[in-house]
């Protein structure tokens, strides 16, 4: 088995799959949920396994490890929030990933009873409509009940590191 990039390895191991999929740049999200509108009941985690599913109805999906407390918390509350982080929120991401303790940087806003991170580019308050087991993860499909967004630069994750975006070409949205 080889660790060299660019060589074909016939064995698909979790490590090699993680390295391969790490080459797909993604935004960084914090998934949150709470039993009530009290900051002491908030549970959150950093996640990049998030995607849109449908525009009509408005559905998104987050993939959570079955070993994570968040999987149980989402099942218990039936709701979750997605905060898509801004470029200056790396410390917040690290806080929720357990890599750093930065409680002074964590401020919540509440939308539809769901905690979301102040300063994020996007807030999505979701109600779980389906949960599907998928290997060692659960795919939680959520209906977006309320959303908010702002302009700015996103925090990006690529090959295990935080990055920023560089504009290539035109500075206009593609039909949005």
Swiss-Prot record:
EC category name: oxidoreductase
Source organism superkingdom: Bacteria
Catalytic reaction annotation: a reduced flavin + NAD(+) = an oxidized flavin + NADH + 2 H(+)
pH sensitivity of activity: Optimum pH is 7.5.
Cysteine disulfide links: none
Induction: By 4-NP in the presence of NphR.
Residues at which FAD binds: 39-46, 48-49, 63-65, 69-70, 95-96
Regions annotated as coiled coil: none
InterPro entries: Flavin_Rdtase-like_dom, NADH-dep_flavin_reductase, Split_barrel_FMN-bd
Cited function: Catalyzes the reduction of FAD with the concomitant oxidation of NADH. NAD is the physiological electron donor. Subsequently, the reduced flavins diffuse to the oxygenase component NphA2.
EC number of this enzyme: 1.5.1.36
Residues annotated to bind NAD(+): 52, 137, 157-160
Protein name: NADH-dependent flavin reductase
Keywords: FAD, Flavoprotein, NAD, Oxidoreductase
Presence of the UniProt keyword ATP-binding in the record: no
GO biological process, one term: 4-nitrophenol catabolic process
Molecular function via GO: FAD binding; flavin reductase (NADH) activity; FMN binding; NAD binding; riboflavin reductase (NADPH) activity
Assembly information from the UniProt record: Homodimer. 4-nitrophenol 2-monooxygenase complex consists of an oxygenase component NphA1 and a flavin reductase component NphA2.
Source species: Rhodococcus sp
Entries under SMART domains matching the protein: Flavin_Reduct
Family statement drawn from the similarity comment of this UniProt entry: Belongs to the non-flavoprotein flavin reductase family.
